[in-house]
Structure formats: structure tokens, C-alpha cells
């Protein structure tokens, strides 16, 4: 009887250990899947630095643009460039500006108010060997535009990817226009919360296309001071892709 009890106890513990091992393996698989998805979301998609991994900002809940959304954006505005200067405002990891450099832009200016973001952008630029083509500054958006105006800067492409609580993207674009920071025909990529609506056109900005990816919306504007230059406006797409 005692031997039977010992045998049953042994089998019970064996089963418990087996269940524990299976659960541990499942957790490891889930963690590995998460790591793979994160890694896919922070790489250069195309161009000279294609496939190079980009660091995320440590300890911050930034929303780096996923590869699918990034590829969709550049398909709408490029996908490649024959020179030009790009401004990555609210730069975060610098992923969008770095992608533009990788795809042919000559110069990039990165602006962010967080020191950790600035350090991450510099690290990412070094990792993809594009630091010589970039300038990185810590400042808030409004002050940064004043500084850029004094320097006589002008841009062909602008990325505006502010926190979702920021609802004044159109005002910021008008400020850039008044400060003559935009070249004729400049393209502005505005990312914002999908539930929010920006005007299709305003001032000298003409909406070329709007696409929605889960919680994120992207509107492409073109800056034109000459009437009749903006074509292909009023297009809108919806997708199920989400940002991180």
C-alpha cells in the first residue's frame, strides 16, 4: 500500500513538473514573439540602410512607427528621393527621418524635447552610419521653429508625429509657412489619433491623401503657394494595422 502511495505521489509530482515546464515554454514563446514584433517595428525598411535595427527610447512610452505603416507612408510620398532636406519634429527614435535619409534625402534635422530621445536618435544615426548627414537638437517644437527661422532653414519634407494629446498640427504647419521654413511643393506628413479630424485643405496646404491604421491616422499635405498645383487630393484609405 505504501509503495502504491509513493508511486502515485511520484507520478503526481512528475505531472506537476511537466505542467510547469510546458507553461514556462509557453511564456518563453510569447516573449520571443513579442521581441520579434518589436524588432520588426524598429528597423530601417528600405534604402542604403535597409534592415539596420533601430533602438527604442528607454523607459518611455513612445510610439515608433511600425514597418507596415512606415512603408505605406513612404509609398505615398516617395518611395525614394533625389536629394532634399527633411525635418523630423517630435522625432522620438528618429525612425522617420532616418528612413528618409536611407531613401535618398541629403540632410535631416531631428528635434525632440526629451534628452533620452536625443541620445537614442544619435545612437541610431551612428548605427546606420548617417550621422554626418544629420543635425540633432533638443528643444520644444515652437522654439525649434524660431531657431530654424533665424538660421534660414527650409525643408522639402516634414514629419509631424506629436503625442496624441497634441491637436494643433495645422497651427504648427501654418507657423512653419509664416516663418518660410517650407520650400515650394514641400510635403508634410502629419500623424495623429485616428478619431480626430484635420481639415482636408487650409491656407497653402492641400491634403493629398489620408490613411488610417488602427488608432493612427496619417494625412499627407503639400505646401503650394500657386493655385492649381495640388492634384490627387481627397483620397482616403482605412487599414487594420496598429502602431506600437
Where are these regions (language model features)?
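Polybasic, lysine-rich low-complexity intrinsically disordered segments
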Residues: 2-4
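Class I S-adenosyl-L-methionine-dependent methyltransferase catalytic core
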Residues: 7-244
Amino acid at each position: 500500500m505504501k509503495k502504491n502511495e509513493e508511486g502515485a505521489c511520484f507520478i503526481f509530482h512528475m505531472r506537476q513538473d511537466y505542467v510547469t515546464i510546458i507553461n514556462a515554454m509557453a511564456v518563453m514563446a510569447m516573449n520571443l514573439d513579442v521581441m520579434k514584433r518589436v524588432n520588426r517595428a524598429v528597423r530601417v525598411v528600405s534604402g542604403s540602410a535597409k534592415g539596420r535595427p533601430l533602438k527604442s527610447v528607454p523607459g518611455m512610452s513612445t510610439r515608433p512607427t511600425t514597418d507596415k505603416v512606415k512603408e505605406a507612408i513612404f509609398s505615398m510620398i516617395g518611395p525614394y528621393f533625389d536629394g532634399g532636406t527633411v525635418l523630423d519634429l517630435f522625432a522620438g527614435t528618429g525612425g522617420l527621418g532616418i528612413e528618409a535619409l536611407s531613401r535618398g534625402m541629403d540632410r535631416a534635422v531631428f528635434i525632440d524635447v526629451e534628452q533620452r530621445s536625443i541620445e537614442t536618435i544619435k545612437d541610431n544615426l551612428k548605427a546606420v552610419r548617417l550621422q554626418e548627414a544629420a543635425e540633432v537638437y533638443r528643444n520644444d517644437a515652437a522654439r525649434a521653429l524660431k531657431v530654424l527661422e533665424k538660421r534660414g532653414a527650409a525643408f522639402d519634407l516634414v514629419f509631424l508625429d506629436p503625442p496624441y494629446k497634441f491637436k494643433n498640427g495645422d497651427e504648427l504647419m501654418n507657423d512653419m509657412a509664416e516663418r518660410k521654413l517650407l520650400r515650394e511643393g514641400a510635403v508634410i506628413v502629419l500623424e495623429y489619433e485616428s478619431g480626430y479630424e484635420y481639415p482636408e485643405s487650409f491656407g497653402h496646404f492641400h491634403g493629398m491623401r489620408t490613411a488610417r491604421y488602427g488608432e493612427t491616422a496619417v494625412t499627407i499635405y503639400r505646401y503650394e503657394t500657386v493655385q492649381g498645383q495640388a492634384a490627387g487630393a481627397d483620397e482616403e484609405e482605412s487599414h487594420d494595422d496598429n502602431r506600437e
